[in-house]
């Protein structure tokens, strides 16, 4: 982005620049020299040098996160890059003796069920234009494979159109300084440009760190089960820089840092999984079900932070000073709130902590869920509504809950929301949308992408035009979030002496208003066959006569003295989305109560 389109920078001179300025024209004394400052002054005629202005000395624990803006000026990422991928079989030792059909058949969940690592194939990656590979670009004139390729992603790995991770082999070159090329189809996202839009926006936000992105037109030639072939059109992808040690170094961060990709993590202690590698019971797969290790394997700093954070006797003001950067969390959260990127309360974010620092920072990751309210309305899918809108979306996360309960953090978040609201103005979003449409619509309305696009052309036009409006709606929703009670969890009912015991966690109100609950029990999730209903319940529990064996639904809502109502965290999943504030359970013939669970 142009400089005038950025949020004004509040930059501190780098240490190297400061030292260079101080040392210019100065004699450097050799180690162990006995020449004194006074002697040096005498040698210069007794005239004392003028006092120089120095940048104040900073502590490592007080450093704000800043990206390397010059990194984005090296390459033009505003258009489309054409990539050619020739895949072939490799060998058993490197897990590459597989077919391209196998790569595209199995999901991440299939590999977990089979207990095997993800299959790979050998690949030759070449970069060029629509006429073919170009001189001077990666892979030009090369015939032997220079990479491996496998599927990437979790839930997206079940899609017909896969995401791919292309990993260039050592000493086989790199593309824009990157050896891992992540290609994302964003198949469930109707516009196909939201993730790139997010990272392009983040470039202009000093308080956040982004990643390099590029639209890619991919062609694949499959030689895994045949001797010859042609390049087939795989449509439009978005390349997103892989967040690893190489990326940390490129962005001016510490490559020896602790870096975790959050798979599912709400900042609880998780004693059974989050352990030191020296612990005899340490299991990496269990650990990585919560946090995928991308940096240092020394987890002691992480454990120390989690133990302090989960000790409610520890003042959050002090913890924010010691273990977190308020600015970083506030701007990260403000961006997610304004863009409606709700699937960030327990995943789709990285944790980063520099070596020799106790501070943890949030790094943005995966934004294809942003600004999708209008799209979900048009396709008739219910998600990211109810408590998932606004600050209540983050209430189930220990870190975010304790932040929101702290006045200093709320003030910082208020300021960040206001500043980013001005930055994410309608003119900017409309201009960016027009640019992305001019690129992506060349590809998405033709094969192969048009077959899997979840929206029609008229719907696409409506969705794209509504993006600025969604930001404004989210901005207006933000202060409303503090007026409502916070969401809470419904407990699993229990049978005791012929009665059904119903319970839930207490709700929280920022103004400490009285809260009452409405409790309902029904045979259906639409609550047309209600068996029990009670309003103005004061305590987080009640009971009713035990029904017979069968499937049941409990719904609990909290209302404060001002009349604002909030749903419970629980929801029941149907084909068209979520039914909020509802828990499904079964009473078995032997009297056992079983909660209805499912995989997201």
Outline where the language-model segments fall:
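Middle-to-C-terminal accessory/interaction subdomains
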Residues: 59-61, 93, 159, 295-303, ...
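A conserved hydrophobic secondary-structure block that centers on an alpha-helix together
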Residues: 175-235, 312-324
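Internal "kinase-insert"/substrate-recognition segments embedded within catalytic cores
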Residues: 170-172, 208-211, 227-334, 342
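Conserved NTP-binding catalytic cores of kinases and kinase-like/nucleotidyltransferase enzymes
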Residues: 39-197
């Amino acid at each position: 982005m142009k400089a005038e389109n950025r949020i004004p920078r509040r930059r501190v001179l780098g240490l190297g620049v400061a030292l260079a300025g101080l040392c210019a024209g100065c004699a450097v004394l050799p180690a162990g020299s006995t020449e004194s400052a006074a002697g040096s002054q005498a040698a210069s005629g007794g005239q004392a040098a003028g006092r120089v202005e120095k940048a104040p000395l900073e502590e490592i624990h007080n450093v704000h996160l800043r990206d390397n803006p010059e990194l984005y000026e090296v390459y033009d990422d505003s258009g489309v890059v054409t990539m050619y991928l020739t895949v072939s079989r490799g060998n058993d030792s490197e897990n590459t003796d597989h077919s391209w059909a196998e790569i595209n058949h199995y999901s991440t969940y299939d590999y977990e069920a089979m207990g095997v690592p993800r299959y790979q194939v050998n690949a030759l990656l070449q970069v060029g234009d629509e006429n073919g590979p170009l001189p001077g670009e990666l892979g030009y004139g090369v015939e032997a494979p220079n990479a491996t390729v496998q599927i990437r992603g979790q839930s997206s790995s079940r899609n017909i159109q896969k995401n791919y991770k292309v990993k260039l082999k050592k000493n086989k070159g790199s593309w824009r300084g990157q050896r891992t090329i992540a290609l994302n189809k964003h198949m469930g996202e109707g516009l196909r440009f939201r993730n790139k839009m997010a990272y392009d926006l983040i470039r202009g936000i000093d308080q956040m760190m982004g990643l390099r992105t590029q639209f890619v037109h991919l062609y694949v030639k499959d030689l895994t089960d045949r001797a010859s072939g042609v390049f087939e059109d795989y449509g439009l992808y978005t390349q997103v820089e892989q967040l690893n040690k190489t990326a940390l170094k490129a962005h001016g961060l510490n490559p020896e840092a602790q870096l975790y990709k959050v798979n599912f993590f709400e900042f609880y202690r998780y004693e059974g999984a989050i352990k030191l590698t020296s612990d005899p019971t340490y299991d990496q797969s269990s650990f990585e079900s919560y946090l995928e290790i991308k940096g240092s394997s020394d987890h002691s700093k992480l454990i120390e932070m989690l133990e302090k954070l989960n000790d409610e006797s520890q003042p959050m003001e002090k913890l924010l000073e010691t273990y977190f950067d308020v600015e970083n969390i506030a701007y990260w959260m403000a961006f997610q709130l304004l863009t409606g990127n709700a699937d960030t309360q327990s995943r789709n974010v990285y944790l980063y902590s520099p070596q020799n620092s106790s501070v943890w920072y949030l790094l943005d990751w995966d934004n294809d869920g942003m600004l999708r309210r209008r799209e979900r309305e048009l396709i008739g899918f219910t998600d990211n509504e109810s408590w998932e809108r606004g600050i209540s979306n983050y209430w189930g996360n220990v870190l975010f809950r304790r932040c929101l309960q702290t006045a200093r953090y709320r003030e910082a978040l208020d300021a960040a929301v206001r500043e980013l609201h001005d930055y994410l103005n309608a003119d900017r979003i409309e201009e960016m949308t027009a640019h992305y449409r001019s690129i992506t619509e060349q590809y998405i309305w033709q094969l192969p992408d048009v077959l899997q696009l979840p929206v029609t052309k008229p719907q696409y036009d409506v969705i794209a035009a509504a993006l600025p409006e969604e930001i404004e709606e989210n901005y207006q929703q933000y202060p409303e979030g503090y007026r409502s009670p916070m969401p809470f969890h419904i407990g699993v009912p229990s049978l005791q002496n012929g009665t059904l015991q119903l319970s839930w966690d207490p709700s929280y109100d920022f103004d400490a208003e009285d809260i009452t609950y409405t409790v309902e029990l029904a045979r259906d999730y639409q609550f047309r066959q209600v068996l029990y209903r009670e309003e103005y319940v004061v305590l987080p529990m009640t009971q009713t006569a035990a029904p017979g064996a069968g499937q049941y639904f409990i719904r609990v809502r909290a209302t404060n003295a001002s009349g604002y109502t909030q749903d419970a965290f629980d929801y029941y999943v149907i084909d068209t989305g979520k039914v909020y504030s509802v828990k499904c359970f079964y009473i078995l013939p032997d009297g056992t109560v079983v909660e209805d669970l499912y995989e997201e």
